[in-house]
From Swiss-Prot:
Binding site for heme b b566: H97, H196
PANTHER family, per the entry: CYTOCHROME B
Name this protein carries in UniProt: Cytochrome b
Binding-site list for heme b b562: H83, H182
Transmembrane region(s): 33-53, 77-98, 113-133, 178-198, 226-246, 288-308, 320-340, 347-367
Pfam families documented for this protein: Cytochrom_B_C, Cytochrome_B
Primary gene name: MT-CYB
Compartments (UniProt record): Mitochondrion inner membrane
Species whose genome carries this gene: Fossa fossana
Names of required cofactors: heme b
């Protein structure tokens, strides 16, 4: 009798994806983040489901319902904080995952890479709408400022914003539809993630050397299942340390004040994982220019395959490109810091320089370094 694991139509798919999957023998811990993202997604869907059972998407009661979850619902506080901090862990894993892809040249798998970019946009949209739901001051003003950016689109901008709002300002209709979208998007993300995996398994995984690993494969289970469990335990440890010791560390104190359209907070800023993009947006004095730069800061990932000038796939043996990559990481950290600062001197100038450096590094310096390294190979 054939093993049910290899013959059953459904179990066979799981087997080919997580058990008998041929994996390169030399992939490092940087390849752990894909499975961690899957765990984060499942965690967010489960905690979100329980939160949705007690949450009300009405401007009059939304803030109170979140307070009710924290005070009166059994273990409501831990579910709420696991969901809020789970989003932060999700983005940490996402940034590491994308960074790994850039460093080791994974963008040569164009379908997998492009679906990954779609996933990034979907997760960012979900996180933004989720931040609006508690209906605190930063929720309301964040929603107002970010949705208002669409009014920069010529001709249709104003109509588009009012259509998204469902009125002439962020109000009950906006909150209700954001809740609906926030609920449905994670399931769309799950479907996209399945397609992401499907395309990845068509080509097989990349590895640190950037060379083909067809001649040296090992089964995913037990080698990488045990390796992934270590990463998972570390993820849970960091998440639970955050949740149990300082659950509001990454949040904004303004969000503990109920939304008030008549009172603007002194510094409107999004969650920490959007600050780099927010800093790029603010660094351009023109509204349309800022919005364009904001979108391009993420969309630039889509043209990375076109900017790849090197004959080598990854950056493992390319010291010049490595320096530029870590310069880019430092630049993104600088942008994240600037995004959380008030709009005044010297932060404006630092933000503008960091924004220029971001695009300059990706569009010009990295392709040039690839060409230089190609020449060095001949020596």
């Amino acid at each position: 009798m054939t093993n049910i694991r290899k013959s059953h139509p459904l179990i066979k798919i799981i087997n080919e994806s997580f058990i008998d999957l041929p994996a390169p023998s030399n992939i490092s811990a940087w390849w752990n983040f894909g499975s961690l993202l899957g765990v984060c997604l499942i965690l967010q869907i489960l905690t979100g489901l329980f939160l949705a059972m007690h949450y009300t998407s009405d401007t009059a009661t939304a803030f109170s319902s979140v307070t009710h979850i924290c005070r009166d619902v059994n273990y409501g506080w831990i579910i709420r904080y696991m969901h809020a901090n789970g989003a932060s862990m999700f983005f940490i894993c996402l940034f590491m995952h994308v960074g790994r892809g850039m460093y080791y040249g994974s963008h040569t798998f164009s379908e997998t890479w492009n679906i990954g970019i779609l996933l990034l946009f979907a997760v960012m949209a979900t996180a933004f709408m989720g931040y609006v739901l508690p209906w605190g001051q930063m929720s309301f003003w964040g929603a107002t400022v970010i949705t208002n950016l669409l009014s920069a689109i010529p001709y249709i901008g104003t109509n588009l914003v009012e259509w998204i709002w469902g009125g002439f300002s962020v109000d009950k209709a906006t909150l209700t539809r954001f809740f609906a979208f926030h609920f449905i998007l994670p399931f769309i993300i799950s479907a996209l993630a399945a397609v992401h995996l499907l395309f990845l398994h068509e080509t097989g995984s990349n590895n640190p050397s950037g060379l083909t690993s067809d001649s040296d494969k090992i089964p995913f289970h037990p080698y990488y299942t045990i390796k992934d469990i270590l990463g998972l335990l570390l993820l849970i440890l960091i998440l639970m340390l955050l949740v149990l010791f300082s659950p509001d560390l990454l949040g904004d104190p303004d969000n503990y004040t109920p939304a008030n359209p008549l009172n603007t907070p002194p510094h409107i800023k999004p969650e920490w994982y959007f600050l780099f993009a927010y800093a790029i947006l603010r660094s351009i004095p023109n509204k349309l220019g800022g919005v364009t730069a904001l979108v391009l800061s993420i969309l630039i990932l889509a043209i990375l395959p076109l900017l790849n000038t090197s004959k080598q796939r990854g950056m493992m043996f390319r010291p010049l490109s490595q320096c530029l990559f870590w310069l880019l990481v430092a630049d993104l950290l600088t942008l994240t810091w600037i995004g959380g600062q008030p709009v005044e001197h010297p932060f404006i100038t630092i933000g503008q320089l960091a924004s220029i450096l971001y695009f300059l590094t990706i569009l010009i310096l990295m392709p040039i370094s690839g060409m230089i390294e190609n020449q060095l190979l001949k020596w």
